[in-house]
């Protein structure tokens, strides 16, 4: 499935900012992607030193900051995003989704839609890059909406998509 339609979305701001980073990738081997490392510097996270360290939370934090919101404390920990914004029962465009992962860790990204069984998640460190992946709905532990400063953007909505593409089972 192609997600090119996301480039035409005018909001919410987190989706617009996330799409600017689409396709950012880890560098294979000993080297690191300086773009990913710069996100940590911009956020003041001095202990983040290499892109082989899980960076889904780093991606969400830089997007949230650039969209004008305050990231959560210890933003690299995916499960900490359960405290961001307001809890929702239905995921809509731009909502932050927090997932479980084997071993007790988590994963975090932005909702761009859903099919019958999966959320379509725009996130970092999904196959070592920023892209959209299908993640099983039953792994989602939190749906969080940005704390809009004026009003919710008019295009924040539920987006139903076709069940197309591989199912992500381990986002590291």
Predicted feature locations:
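N-terminal capping segments
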Residues: 1-69, 152-172
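Short alpha-helical interface elements
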Residues: 42-47, 84-89, 146
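...with weaker cross-activation on analogous glycine-rich loops/strands in unrelated enzymes
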Residues: 7-12, 61, 69-131
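Intrinsically disordered regions, especially transient/low-confidence alpha-helical propensity segments
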Residues: 2, 36, 52, 73-81, ...
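Intrinsically disordered, low-complexity, charged/polar segments
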Residues: 133-161
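Glycine-rich catalytic cores of cysteine/serine-nucleophile enzymes that process amide/ester linkages
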Residues: 30-53, 100-141
């Amino acid at each position: 499935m192609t997600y090119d339609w996301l480039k035409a979305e005018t909001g919410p701001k987190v989706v617009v900012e996330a799409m600017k980073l689409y396709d950012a990738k880890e560098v294979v081997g000993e080297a690191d992607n300086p773009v990913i490392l710069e996100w940590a510097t911009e956020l003041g996270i001095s202990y983040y030193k290499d892109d082989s360290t899980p960076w889904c939370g780093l991606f969400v934090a830089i997007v949230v900051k650039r969209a004008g919101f305050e990231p959560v404390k210890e933003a690299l920990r995916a499960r900490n995003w359960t405290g961001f914004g307001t809890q929702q029962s239905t995921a809509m465009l731009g909502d932050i989704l927090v997932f479980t992962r084997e071993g007790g860790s988590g994963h975090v990204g932005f909702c761009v839609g859903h099919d019958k069984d999966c959320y379509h998640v725009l996130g970092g460190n999904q196959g070592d890059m920023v892209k959209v992946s299908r993640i099983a709905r039953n792994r989602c532990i939190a749906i969080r909406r940005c704390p809009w400063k004026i009003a919710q953007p008019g295009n924040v909505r539920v987006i139903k998509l076709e069940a197309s593409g591989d199912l992500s089972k381990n986002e590291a």
